[in-house]
């Protein structure tokens, strides 16, 4: 920033024209604003003049070229006629070049071919607007098809989502099946028919084993209790003895 100059805001858009200052809200309301400027009907683009009142495609007569087709609306028939005329003129030119290359008819046939090709090109350009409309129509049809496919996909996703939600609601509202009975090997049992309230039970096999062992099991239990008995805090030996005692009882 230069010294003595403050920050200046530069707009990326050009300033409005000077006559815009004459169109204030007050002048527009009281009718004192001048009439708007007339639109340009003639302009130049790359040195070529254009007039808005003229046709989009100027006729050949304006360019000083003979118009060989009569009805431009029946363009297929006229294009076939011009094509045949071009072929005949070309054969005539070849024959002249073979027999008499310096004959004056050679220049005439070349001019005829030039005129025929200009007419064919001009007739094609006459249907550029028709081609543009058809291109827009085809583009819109494709866009409609794409939108229809997208709508179908959305409907399918919505239907699948509703099915999933309905299934979940049915599972919540429906009555849950009764829990299965636990096996005897798990050593658990149900309390009041509730699955999450389990109580450990002593298996019947352990009871039978204890009854069969009899006095031997009682002696072993008494010996372990004697080793683990001590006044005061238990030592490491007695803690190990108690652990062995618990393990033996579980077996």
UniProtKB/Swiss-Prot annotation:
BP term (GO), one: regulation of transcription by RNA polymerase II
Compartments in which it is found: Nucleus
The organism of origin for this protein: Caenorhabditis elegans
Function: Component of the Mediator complex, a coactivator involved in the regulated transcription of nearly all RNA polymerase II-dependent genes. Mediator functions as a bridge to convey information from gene-specific regulatory proteins to the basal RNA polymerase II transcription machinery. Mediator is recruited to promoters by direct interactions with regulatory proteins and serves as a scaffold for the assembly of a functional preinitiation complex with RNA polymerase II and the general transcription factors. Required for germ cell development and gonadal growth.
Annotated protein name in UniProt: Mediator of RNA polymerase II transcription subunit 7
Single GO MF annotation: transcription coregulator activity
Keyword entries, A-Z: Activator, Developmental protein, Nucleus, Transcription, Transcription regulation
Assembly with partners or alone: Component of the Mediator complex. Interacts with mdt-10 and mdt-21. Interacts with RNA polymerase II.
Region ranges (Disordered): 1-38
Entry-linked Gene3D superfamilies: 6.10.140.200
Family assignment from sequence similarity: Belongs to the Mediator complex subunit 7 family.
Main localization of the protein described in the UniProt heading: nucleus
SUPFAM superfamilies listed in its UniProt record: Mediator hinge subcomplex-like
GO cellular component assignments: core mediator complex; mediator complex
Compositionally biased intervals (Polar residues): 22-32
């Amino acid at each position: 920033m230069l010294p003595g100059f403050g920050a200046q805001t530069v707009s990326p858009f050009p300033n409005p024209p000077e006559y815009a200052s004459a169109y204030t809200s007050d002048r527009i309301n009281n009718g004192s604003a001048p009439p708007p400027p007339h639109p340009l009907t003639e302009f130049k683009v790359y040195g070529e003049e254009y007039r808005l009142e003229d046709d989009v495609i100027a006729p050949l007569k304006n360019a000083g070229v003979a118009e060989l087709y009569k009805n431009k609306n029946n363009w297929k028939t006229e294009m076939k006629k011009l094509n045949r005329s071009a072929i005949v003129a070309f054969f005539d030119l070849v024959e002249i070049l073979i027999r008499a290359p310096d004959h004056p008819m050679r220049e005439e046939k070349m001019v005829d071919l030039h005129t025929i090709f200009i007419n064919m090109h001009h007739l094609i350009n006459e249907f550029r607007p028709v081609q543009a409309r058809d291109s827009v129509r085809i583009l819109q049809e494709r866009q409609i098809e794409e939108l229809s496919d997208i709508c179908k996909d959305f409907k399918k996703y919505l239907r699948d989502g509703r099915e999933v939600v309905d299934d979940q609601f049915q599972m919540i509202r429906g009555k849950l099946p009764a829990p299965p009975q636990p096996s005897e090997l798990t050593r658990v049992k149900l309390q009041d028919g509730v699955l999450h309230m389990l109580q450990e039970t002593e298996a019947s096999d352990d009871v039978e084993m204890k009854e069969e062992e009899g006095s031997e099991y009682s002696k072993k239990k008494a010996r372990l209790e004697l080793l683990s008995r001590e006044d005061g805090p238990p030592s490491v030996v007695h803690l190990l003895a108690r652990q062995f005692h618990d393990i033996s009882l579980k077996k």
